[in-house]
Amino acid sequence: MNIVILAAGTGKRMRSALPKVLHPLAGRPLLSHVIDTARTLQPSRLVVVVGHGAEQVQAAVAAPDVQFAVQAEQLGTGHAVRQALPLLDPAQPTLVLYGDVPLTRASTLQRLVDAAREGRYGILTVTLDDPTGYGRIVRDAAGFVTRIVEQKDASPEQLKIAEINTGIIVTPTAQLSMWLGALKNENAQGEYYLTDVVELAIEAGFEVVTAQPDEEWETLGVNSKAQLAELERIHQRNIAEALLVDGVTLADPARLDVRGTLRCGRDVSIDVNCVFEGNVTLADNVTIGANCVIRNASVGAGTRIDAFTHIDGAELGAHTVIGPYARLRPGAQLADEAHVGNFVEVKNAVIGHGSKANHLTYIGDADIGARVNIGAGTITCNYDGANKFRTVIEDDVFVGSDTQLVAPVRVGRGVTIAAGTTIWKDVADGLLALNEKTQTAKSGYVRPVKKKS
């Protein structure tokens, strides 16, 4: 089977310099959703017709299995499909999709493809309570499709028809070239419409069949930011419903955003306003607090992530405790039972089993062993203005508050670092490290008094 995806439109009503098909739905371009669905049908040829912003669109979705045809002038959907003809296998049927209709299920498309086997012409239709504005499917007394009539051309009787054309079709490819060549642009827009092909197919004696989606929203397209927002909510609702079916506890399914793939184990609980991006895995008994953002991360069983935590590219072991207001950046690896508390940032660092950094700390480019206590206000000074260096803190170290570790530096096993210490040289195992300081208390001191104006 050939699949052609039309993605050449300007999208004027989006009021944006970004090509319409590149506007994000759940964090990914609209067109990417359509391509992914198309791939599940395993086409032999997958062709995207580009036009407005062609180079930008091609760069966004380029892949070895995707070919591109260019529609230099936007002269209608029929003209767009014609540009793809040289790239198609004429011996196989062609399925035509739209780059701004992202939620059509693969099962729906397969149903249409199956209906159109043996050289039939297939149309995906949907029955609406209010079909205003859509082309109607006209059938004869025997129920066979005879034509598609647009709203402006429909008779009062035809306007009562609730079955409408979605634009998604399956057509014999060998005949498609002839039919497209016979299209006329005698309409207000001066364009060649793919919908006109159905009458040519009927005139040529081809049987026209239809299939319908399970849900109306599968055929909704995007022509404005309002419609994009509507589809975003539909998509997120579908994701939330699937998570609930799988046993995930959602404090409010309407306040969850998944912009990628979220895999959850048993008894996972997610509070409100959480965003998951990229590939995220939550193991059994993970609890996520409110207003967290988690991107490309794996979270071990029994972990608790408190509110307002931001995690990006991190790996968390089992029974870790994170947040609130913590930030784990790419390369952060936490072993089982590690704690990272409020206003702690970890970047490209390993924190060992049971180690804790509970308050106001920066840990960057570091290797921290097991059972280490990092006091509040500790900083690994990893950057000299030109290069990054690593800090190594071995097992069972106690780091007092307000400590600076100037990398590259190593702190041996069992070391105790006094509060307010700057470490710039390696410290051997078991020692106490401190900077000698003198405390002075003076009598007779009088605080300044604010002058009265």
From Swiss-Prot:
PROSITE patterns: HEXAPEP_TRANSFERASES (PS00101). Binds 1 Mg(2+) ion per subunit. The active site is at 359 (proton acceptor). Its cofactor is Mg(2+). It catalyses: alpha-D-glucosamine 1-phosphate + acetyl-CoA = N-acetyl-alpha-D-glucosamine 1-phosphate + CoA + H(+); N-acetyl-alpha-D-glucosamine 1-phosphate + UTP + H(+) = UDP-N-acetyl-alpha-D-glucosamine + diphosphate. Transmembrane segments: none annotated. Mg(2+) binds at residues 100, 223. Residues 226-246 are annotated as: Linker. Acetyl-CoA binds at residues 376, 382-383, 401, 419. Pathway: Nucleotide-sugar biosynthesis; UDP-N-acetyl-alpha-D-glucosamine biosynthesis; N-acetyl-alpha-D-glucosamine 1-phosphate from alpha-D-glucosamine 6-phosphate (route II): step 2/2; Nucleotide-sugar biosynthesis; UDP-N-acetyl-alpha-D-glucosamine biosynthesis; UDP-N-acetyl-alpha-D-glucosamine from N-acetyl-alpha-D-glucosamine 1-phosphate: step 1/1; Bacterial outer membrane biogenesis; LPS lipid A biosynthesis. UDP-N-acetyl-alpha-D-glucosamine binds at residues 6-9, 20, 71, 76-77, 98-100, 135, 150, 165, 223, 329, 347, 362, 373. It is found in: Cytoplasm. Disulfide bonds: none annotated. The keyword Flavoprotein does not apply. Homotrimer. PANTHER family: BIFUNCTIONAL PROTEIN GLMU, NUCLEOTIDYL TRANSFERASE. This is Bifunctional protein GlmU.
